[in-house]
Structure formats: structure tokens, C-alpha cells
Amino acid sequence: MNPVTKQFQFGQSTVTLETGRIARQATGAVLVTMDDVSVLVTVVGAKSPAEGRDFFPLSVHYQEKTYAAGRIPGGFFKREGRPSEKETLTSRLIDRPIRPLFPEGFMNEVQVVCTVVSTNKKSDPDIAAMIGTSAALAISGIPFAGPIGAARVGFHPEIGYILNPTYEQLQSSSLDMVVAGTEDAVLMVESEADELTEDQMLGAVLFAHDEFQAVIRAVKELAAEAGKPAWDWKAPAENTVLVNAIKAELGEAISQAYTITIKQDRYNRLGELRDQAVALFAGEEEGKFPASEVKDVFGLLEYRTVRENIVNGKPRIDGRDTRTVRPLRIEVGVLGKTHGSALFTRGETQALVVATLGTARDAQLLDTLEGERKDAFMLHYNFPPFSVGECGRMGSPGRREIGHGRLARRGVAAMLPTQDEFPYTIRVVSEITESNGSSSMASVCGASLALMDAGVPVKAPVAGIAMGLVKEGEKFAVLTDILGDEDHLGDMDFKVAGTDKGVTALQMDIKINGITEEIMEIALGQALEARLNILGQMNQVIAKPRAELSENAPTMLQMKIDSDKIRDVIGKGGATIRGICEETKASIDIEDDGSVKIYGETKEAAEAAKLRVLAITAEAEIGKIYVGKVERIVDFGAFVNILPGKDGLVHISQISDKRIDKVTDVLQEGQEVKVLVLDVDNRGRIKLSIKDVAAAEASGV
């Protein structure tokens, strides 16, 4: 096919979509160029599903090639390796808005690969990758209810909303939000903010939706000209005979099971009913159905039962109404030897969160397309299988854990002190010990508590809450503090973190069309009500950071030295600073401007190291008495060391009031003596006196 190109204006950026020149064997391939950022997006769809598959195997892989920024990878192998955290998060960002647009019952494998092939280092390539994904799917012929558009939004109080801000603009922005959706609906929001109001956050979502209509129009034009024929695929018809049979036999029992408030008891009862359904209706004889189909229909009845109960105003699975937060239990200081810890329990969701303080050299080194940089704040989220009563894989974190950790980090990051205010590296780890919905928001609450327990001067406590939605026709119910089942069976996952003043993080995933501005306003309003409730209970346990850092945390001292003295402190080949660190058991970081940070496991170690640095950088003061050591004797006097690296000369005439024939008659090498500084010339040479010490002491020097 001949190459086809579409160009359009997207805010301040010129975007070009090109297909038919590169990756022509893929089901769909588009090279998207947004200013100087180019991303190649390919989509491949299997023509038939694998035998026995009962799920939709969609995978999205976003990869940043270092050649795109004119760099060679670091490390020994000099080639790209496993996905970075940034690549994993962007893969999830692309996956979330497209997944709900594939039709129900579509089980063919689909793989999306987004490769950053050129970048200007000024803007994040993620928006270009999302636009390219939309275009590649639109031209592929694969069943897909798109296209989608995507935009990043910043906010400045004086300027207002900013479309697709650059990295530089984001530095002064109070908001970093990515929004994706179709022509009629918003499907995904990912954001972090500096205590913006609910109205400002909603305004940003609507602003993005209006702006990315230009993307959707351009993708439709490209698909009209270069799109492949739509696949001849039809959704499998619902087996109404089996649905009615299971409902008649077990429908009431399923409804009763969903009144059991204890999660494991409820799951056990539903498991028994599912086994009964298989025993009754599965088999190979006539009038029977495959066991997998029976289980699918049983799951469909669960889905309908829970949703009908909720939209008709009946109590939720655990007996709550739509606005009630589950009972909270909040503890801090639960682990004796850690720097800060908290145990946050909300119903059957529990997070054990630990804060650890480290030195500047403990910061995470990030190798990005823009170059290397350090990150002094880390939040790691772990979700072991025992948290849901299961056996499972243990090992390195998966995509979900990385994504949840980043969301929790977004929630608390805006409230952290600056590096100048608090020059420690901070690592927070959230161990999910029980899970039944909204463990990421439990991590936000636990992180805030653990940081305050550690004495980190956060600006304000932060809490988070997860909201849900069930919508059937014109009826809908917004749910506060959703359970795991409500998340799975609902139409929206809406997570909000913030302080009592405003929102710090907002994440939204919507599975259906028809989410109106009214519904989002209600969800944000209920989330605010719940957040203030949780903050009130957290404040009863710990309302502000502890006045002192934990005694287990390293002591950090700061000082400033003349930049000319840096080499003296470091010494030849680093010998001096290494000796100080080995002797005092402290660590020392020196910046080019002379800023010195000293970290010690104890206060005594840090103070000892500081005294050594002060001694090295000190200047000899005229008229001051020092106790020094005779380093070298010459015919005309003796050289005495009075400060580290600083020797002065005591001329033979300045040793004693009496006449001396030989210096060695009075002084010996290694002898300690008191000396008075007489003068320091412009070359730094120090003149000392021993004979004038007594008179100087008598005069009070």
C-alpha cells in the first residue's frame, strides 16, 4: 500500500500520523511525530482465539530506545534491558483506556508495541504513544470501539490550564494530569496535583476532553483513507437457556451469599454454589453444557445480582450504604527499630507501612532518555498473595504493584519538604497484609502516618479513598470505599488522595460510556466527604510530624565551607575524607558550591566528623594560641603543625627569651607545644612564637 499521512494541529504542537511505510506486516502500524518526538506504534491481532481461553489477552509494551535521544545505554551490555519503571507505567497508561473498548467476548490475542525512536528531551513521549496506539488500532480492522484521544494538562494559577506542557512548564505547574477518552466519554485519568480543588480537577478533565477532539477527528480521517476492512467477528450469543436454568436453581442462593459480610466466608459459599452449578448443568450428554460455560454464566449472574441490589438501593455486600467508609483502625510506631511505621486497617484492607531515612547517596539513580538524575523519594508497594488468602508467585514486583506504588507516591509527594528543607533520602514501603479493595489508598494513608511518625516535616497529612460506580440505564449509584468485588463488578474505579485543603492525586478508570459531568461531580463530592472523615480519625492518632527524628534514624548535619577548601577536605586521592569516614563511621557528601552534608548513625559520629572538617578548613587566626606538634626541626627554627594541613614556622629567635645555639636543645620532633600566631602573609605562610605565649595568656588571649 502507498504511504498515507495526516497532519493536524494539537494545541501548540504539530502532529503527523503516517502509515504504510514502516512495519507493513503488522496488523496496524503508525509512525506518529509530535514536534520532534517520534513513536512507532504497531498492533498485531491474532485471527482466532486460543482453544479454551476465557479471557482477553491484551498486552501493551511501551519502550524507550536510548538512540532516540542520541545516547548509548549505560552498564556492561550496552543495550536496552528489562523495562524501566517509567516504561512499565506508560504501558499501563496506554492499556487502561483501550482495554474497555474491545468488545465483550473478544478473546483473540492483541499486542500493542510503542517504540520511541526520536525525542527532543523536552516533552514526555507518552501522549504521542497514546495517539499512535489509537491510530494503529483504528486502521487495523480489529474490533475496537475507538478511536481515543489523549492529552496532558498542566495548571498555573495565573495562566490557567496548559495543554501538553513541556518538562520545563511542569516544573512550575500545580498539576500533571493525563486524560484519555473517546469522542463522547472520558475513560482514564492519571494525575498528581498540589492541593487543587475538586472543581479545578474536574475542569482539567473536561478541558482535556475538549482539546483531544482534534486527535479523534484526525484518526478518523486516517482510518477512512488507510483503514483495513473490519474483521468479520460477532460476539457470542448469550446462552439464555443456561442463564435461566442456573438462575431458577441457584439465583436466590447467590443473592443470599452476597449478604455474607466476611469476604472469605462469602467466597467459600459462592465456591460451593459454583460447584453445585457445575454438578447440575455441566457434562457431555445432551442438555448439558461445558463446565467453563457454566462457570461463565454463574459469574454473569453474580455480576447482575450485585449490580441490581446496589442500583435498587439495597445494602451493599458488607451491609453498608453508598456513602459509609468501613471501620478504621490506625496505629503508629508499631515497629520498634524502624525510623517510622504505621498499621492502617480499613475493614478487610490493611497496610503495614514503613518509612526509612537515608543519605543523599541512597537516592535512586534514574537513567532516562533525558539523562541521568537522582530521585530522593521512593514509595514501594508490595502485594503478597497471602493478603488475599492465596498461594502465589513471590519475587520482583509486577506491573500492578509498580502502578499502585506510583499512585500512592503521587498522593503524598506534593506534601514532602524540599531537599533544602530536609536533605534526607526517603523510602516508604507499603506491605499489603490484607486486601479487600483500595489497597493503594490504604498505602497513601499509611505512608502519611509513617512519615509523620518518622519526624519528616510533611506540610499536611494525606488520606486517600476509592470510589466506585454502578450504572444500569438511567439508574446509577456512586459508592464510597469500594470492596474488591465492587471494583470488579462495577463500572468505574475512581481514586482520590488529598489533604483537608485539596486534591494531591486523582486516578480514574471507566469501563462504560455515559459517565456524565454530574456523576463525576458526585463522585468527587463523596470522595471529599470520605477523605475528611479519614483525616479526622488519622489526626486523633497523630496530627503532625514528631518534633524529633526517630533515634534510629541517621543524624544529618549541614555546613558550608569555602569552595577552595574542598580539595583539602577530600585530600589526595580521597585519602583525607576517607580517613574521616573510617575513623568516625560517618559519611560525608560535598557539593561543588561547598555545601557539606554529614550523616552519622549516631549524633556523636556526625559531630565528630563535623569537627574534623571544621579543623581542616579552619584558618590560622593572628593573635590566637594553638597547641601544636613539632613536625620538623631545621637550623633556623621549627615547623609546628597547628591545624590539619597547616604548619607554621617558629623562628629560633621566637623559641625562648634566652639565647639558643641549637633548636634541638629545646625542642624535639613530635613534641607538643603552645604557640602564638604572629602573622599570616599573603602566601599563607604562618609565623609562630613560643616565647610570647605566656604574655599572651596573661593578657587574656
Curated annotation (Swiss-Prot):
Subunit structure and binding partners: Component of the RNA degradosome, which is a multiprotein complex involved in RNA processing and mRNA degradation.
Organism: Pseudomonas aeruginosa (strain ATCC 15692 / DSM 22644 / CIP 104116 / JCM 14847 / LMG 12228 / 1C / PRS 101 / PAO1)
Keywords linked to the UniProt accession: Cytoplasm, Magnesium, Metal-binding, Nucleotidyltransferase, RNA-binding, Transferase
Principal place of residence: cytoplasm
Gene designation per UniProt: pnp
EC assignment: 2.7.7.8
Upper taxonomic lineage: Bacteria, Pseudomonadati, Pseudomonadota, Gammaproteobacteria, Pseudomonadales
Cited Gene3D superfamilies: GHMP Kinase, N-terminal domain (3.30.230.70), K Homology domain, type 1 (3.30.1370.10), Nucleic acid-binding proteins (2.40.50.140)
Top-rank lineage group of the source organism: Bacteria
InterPro entries linked to this entry: ExoRNase_PH_dom1 (IPR001247), ExoRNase_PH_dom2 (IPR015847), ExoRNase_PH_dom2_sf (IPR036345), KH_dom (IPR004087), KH_dom_type_1 (IPR004088), KH_dom_type_1_sf (IPR036612), NA-bd_OB-fold (IPR012340), PNPase (IPR012162)
Listed GO CC annotations: cytosol
KH domain ranges (all copies): 554-613
Binding site for Mg(2+): D487, D493
SMART domains assigned to the protein according to its UniProt record, in alphabetical order: KH, S1
GO biological process: mRNA catabolic process; RNA catabolic process; RNA processing
Cofactor(s) it depends on: Mg(2+)
Keyword Thylakoid: no
PROSITE patterns, A to Z: KH_TYPE_1 (PS50084), S1 (PS50126)
GO molecular function, one term: 3'-5'-RNA exonuclease activity
Keyword Magnesium: yes
Localization of this protein: Cytoplasm
Similarity comment: Belongs to the polyribonucleotide nucleotidyltransferase family.
Identification of the protein by name: Polyribonucleotide nucleotidyltransferase
